[in-house]
Regions:
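K/E-rich alpha-helical interaction surfaces of small helical-bundle regulatory domains
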Residues: 1-19, 58, 234-254
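Basic, flexible linker segments flanking DNA-binding modules
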Residues: 9-105, 201, 257-264
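An active-site-proximal beta-strand-loop segment
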Residues: 99, 103-138, 144-146
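Generic alpha-helical secondary structure signal
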Residues: 4-11, 27, 182, 189, ...
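C-terminal domain-tail junction helix/linker
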Residues: 188, 214-270
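Active-site beta-loop-alpha junctions of metal-dependent nucleic acid enzymes
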Residues: 122, 141-163, 169
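Mobile genetic element proteins and their domesticated derivatives, centered on retroelements
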Residues: 1-5, 12, 32, 48, ...
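RNase H-like two-metal-ion nuclease catalytic core shared by retroviral integrases
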Residues: 86-88, 172-174, 180-181, 196-216, ...
Length: 270
């Protein structure tokens, strides 16, 4: 056979020896596959590398990338957006935030927005409130109507749970819900300051837009939901997972709530 193929005897046995060797990356491949599965295929190689490090598995990023490619493991990608702008209904606030998305402490700047889902011929709306310090979703509400109760309830819940101090900035777009007196009254009740993106400028609330992009690509697009309840449960579960498990490069590989708790623990020991 070797004579027919023209393959050198030494080359044949060298390849044969390699095939017979145990795969030195077998355990690592298994870990990577588990992380991909646990993250619902939302982690790219960088987050998987971080997760491995958090589990005390030290490996080069390039190795993780190569092994994922060899196993056909790819992360989901993203797609577009609900617009709640209805013109100037009441009050338009200044853009106090001014794209200062990096904050040095919790409860200094909160951002919010509304996004839309479709299931079984019905529209479902999500209103989350996020802390820019650690990107934690502090509270969220779901409804089949994008009314002022939807947005006010999520902000009221966040205030009740996290007790922000005076001077809190609450930033949104110019959606009609945020021009309403109920929203402005809630902000004033804690001595807060209202901030709004400039008209039609999604980059002024880019962090929340980014969260919506991740949420939809990671748990909604490509999935099959048969009812409003099923979709709402999946969104609730995703937000819990995002807060407690979704690793963030900017936070040295910690999930939002991990980073928040670590920061608060340091503050208490000072």
């Amino acid at each position: 056979m070797l004579a027919v193929s023209g393959l050198a005897r030494s080359t044949f046995f060298d390849h044969q020896r390699r095939f017979d060797l145990p795969d030195k990356y077998a355990d690592l491949k298994e870990q990577i596959t588990t992380i991909v599965h646990d993250s619902n295929a939302t982690f790219g190689y960088r987050r998987i590398w971080r997760a491995l490090r958090n589990n005390n598995t030290i490996v080069n990023k390039k190795v993780v990338c190569r092994l994922m490619r060899e196993q056909g493991l790819v992360s989901k990608i993203r797609r577009k957006k609900y617009n709640s702008y209805r013109g100037t209904v009441s009050h338009i606030a200044d853009n106090v935030l001014g794209r200062r998305f990096i904050q040095d402490a919790p409860n200094k700047v909160w951002v919010s927005d509304v996004t839309e889902f479709r299931v079984a011929g019905t529209k479902v709306y999500l209103s989350p409130v996020m802390d820019l310090f650690d990107r934690t979703i502090l509270a969220h509400t779901l409804s089949t109507s994008p009314n002022t109760q939807l947005t006010s309830r999520s902000l009221a819940d966040a205030i009740a749970m996290f007790s922000p101090g005076k001077g809190l900035i609450v930033h949104t777009d110019q959606g009609f819900q945020y021009q309403h007196a109920s929203w402005r009254t809630l902000i004033k009740s804690v001595g807060g300051v209202q901030s709004m993106s400039r008209k039609g400028n999604c980059y002024d609330n880019a962090v929340m837009e980014n969260f919506f992009g991740h949420l939809k690509s990671e748990m909604y697009y490509g999935a099959s939901f048969t009812s409003v309840d099923e979709l709402c449960q999946a969104i609730d579960e995703y937000i819990l997972w995002y807060n407690t498990y979704r690793l963030q490069e900017r936070f040295k590989g910690l999930a939002p709530m991990q980073y928040r708790n670590q920061t608060l623990a340091k503050t208490l020991t000072v």
